[in-house]
Design a protein with these regions (language model features):
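Glycine-rich loop(s) and the adjacent beta-strand/alpha-helix scaffold that form part
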Residues: 70
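N-terminal glycine/serine-rich phosphate-binding loop of ATP-dependent small-molecule kinases
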Residues: 1-58, 73, 105, 162-171
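Short glycine/proline- and acidic residue-enriched helix-loop micro-motifs
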Residues: 1, 76-81
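Gly/Ser/Thr-rich active-site cleft segment
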Residues: 50, 79-184
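Residue-level structural signal for beta-strand termini and adjacent loop
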Residues: 61-62
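Carbohydrate-associated surface elements
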Residues: 65
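Hydrophobic alpha-helix position signal
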Residues: 23, 27, 75-76, 95, ...
Length: 184
């Protein structure tokens, strides 16, 4: 269950073409000429790591990839919190356990929802609901659990990566916060 960047954009183009067609059919031939806003629903789980050149390091791994069993089990024990196979933190830790060479080059990690948002607004953010598909959220801070972030960083410290978990995750936003504007 992996997809290329090209497949993502092809899928979005198909969705927009379908939207245009439906509007034309439903509203007596009216064509969409411009949009004031648009919403895109996408997966809140999965694994999309990018390097400092903003290039994807491995094909997009969806929430349907179930090769993260060991990582999910170990993280659930470490965090004393159930970490599902599909969460981004499970995918990241499984890549570490597998000694995947790309991990050392990660500068940004997101989900499909975060990737599409970043590409259409330039902002590396996630709404709090989608962010909870990456790592548990602390309801007191409305941010990733600082305790779990610290435990994860300590767990992988022997690997000596040049990043900390908090530095590679999208910023968490609550409902109503400005998440950016569509780029031209």
């Amino acid at each position: 269950w992996t997809y290329s960047i090209e497949a993502i954009w092809s899928g979005l183009q198909d969705c927009y073409a379908d939207l245009r067609s439906n509007v034309k059919k439903l509203y007596d031939g009216i064509e969409i000429e411009s949009l004031a806003a648009i919403g895109v629903s996408a997966m809140m789980h999965g694994y999309m790591p990018f390097n400092e050149k903003e290039e994807i390091l491995v094909p997009f791994r969806t929430w349907r990839n179930t090769n993260t069993g060991r990582a999910a089990a170990e993280l659930s024990e470490l965090f004393v919190y159930n970490i599902p196979l599909r969460w981004s933190i499970s995918h990241l830790y499984q890549a570490i356990l597998n000694n995947e060479t790309h991990v050392k080059d990660i500068k940004f990690l997101t989900t499909l929802a975060g990737y599409v948002h970043w590409q259409i607004t330039g902002e590396k953010v996630l709404g709090i609901g989608d962010a909870s598909g990456m790592l548990p959220i602390d309801p007191a801070t409305n941010n990733y659990s600082a305790e779990m972030v610290e435990k994860f960083d300590n767990l992988i410290a022997p690997k000596e990566y040049n990043w900390k978990l908090e530095d590679i995750l999208p910023k968490v936003l609550s409902a109503g916060e400005n998440a950016g504007v569509l780029t031209p």
